């Protein structure tokens, strides 16, 4: 009885490993990070969760400076713009609060109803720069 049970468990383990190995990890290709260096502040943005079927789009944002504190509220100064000019405002910032010289977090937007061909993440006034624009082609 013990031999039969161990064979069943080993078989189940092997079957599960084969299924996991063949499952796709992601439905959308990874998009490259974009960066902006202006007014003594470096901002790097990496799309993390975009694509069809996703309800919330996520962008990892890293800001570094050695001059003035990073006091901007990213929910107020950021917007996502598609190729048709439609603007989407952030619904959440999960990360470091305003202040300091190094901030990191995830900026979240509700996903557009349809998949746009391209998007731009625009940030106004971060580190004293007018507008920083980060662009990605999606289709």
Write out the residue ranges for each language-model feature.
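Short, surface-exposed binding/anchoring microloops in extracellular/periplasmic proteins
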Residues: 44-72
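Short, surface-exposed alpha-helix to beta-strand junction/turn motifs within ectodomains of secreted
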Residues: 71-84
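Short, solvent-exposed, Trp/other aromatic-anchored flexible loops in extracytoplasmic proteins
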Residues: 84-135
